[in-house]
């Protein structure tokens, strides 16, 4: 268990180090809990959250009991991309926060990639 958490932390720090080099672009950050998925677009130069979406939003909340799945991740990706475009954000850098690029993370990224550039 400790080695899995250690691998996660190493992956997370490696990703954050690469993202820190691209300070001129906004960051699309994701977080997964046991029941929900959260995505937010952050401007690191101003330390401000530009837009956010999650399975707690009213549009997605009433669909299913289980919220942390691929189907809802695609809807969150589309929703966060729409909010980003409406706020004037065209290009972001994807911060997967140490999670492997598979399943829910991949579905969210692919859905968001249809409207905004990574």
Curated annotation (Swiss-Prot):
Family: Belongs to the universal ribosomal protein uL18 family.
Gene Ontology molecular function: any one: 5S rRNA binding
Keyword Ribonucleoprotein assigned: yes
Protein name, per record: Large ribosomal subunit protein uL18
HAMAP family with a match to the protein in the record: Ribosomal_uL18_B
The organism's taxonomic lineage, starting at the top: Bacteria, Pseudomonadati, Pseudomonadota, Alphaproteobacteria, Rickettsiales
Subunit comment: Part of the 50S ribosomal subunit; part of the 5S rRNA/L5/L18/L25 subcomplex. Contacts the 5S and 23S rRNAs.
Species in which this protein is naturally found: Rickettsia bellii (strain OSU 85-389)
One Pfam family in the UniProt entry: Ribosomal_L18p
GO cellular-component term (any): cytosolic large ribosomal subunit
Signal peptide (UniProt feature, chain positions): none
GO biological process: translation
InterPro entries in the record: Ribosomal_uL18_bac-type (IPR004389), Ribosomal_uL18_bac/euk (IPR005484)
CDD domains: Ribosomal_L18_L5e
Functional summary from the UniProt entry: This is one of the proteins that bind and probably mediate the attachment of the 5S RNA into the large ribosomal subunit, where it forms part of the central protuberance.
Entry-linked Gene3D superfamilies: 3.30.420.100
Entry keyword set: Ribonucleoprotein, Ribosomal protein, RNA-binding, rRNA-binding
């Amino acid at each position: 268990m400790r080695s899995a958490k250690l691998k996660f932390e190493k992956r997370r720090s490696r990703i954050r180090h690469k993202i820190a080099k691209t300070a001129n672009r906004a960051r699309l950050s994701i977080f997964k809990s046991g029941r929900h998925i959260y995505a937010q677009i952050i401007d690191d130069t101003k330390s401000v959250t530009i837009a956010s979406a999650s399975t707690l939003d009213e549009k997605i909340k009433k669909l299913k009991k289980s919220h942390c799945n691929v189907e809802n991740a695609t809807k969150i990706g589309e929703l966060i991309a729409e909010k980003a475009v409406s706020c004037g954000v065209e290009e972001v850098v994807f911060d997967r926060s140490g999670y492997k690029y598979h399943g829910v993370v991949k579905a969210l990224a692919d859905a968001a990639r249809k409207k905004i550039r990574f």
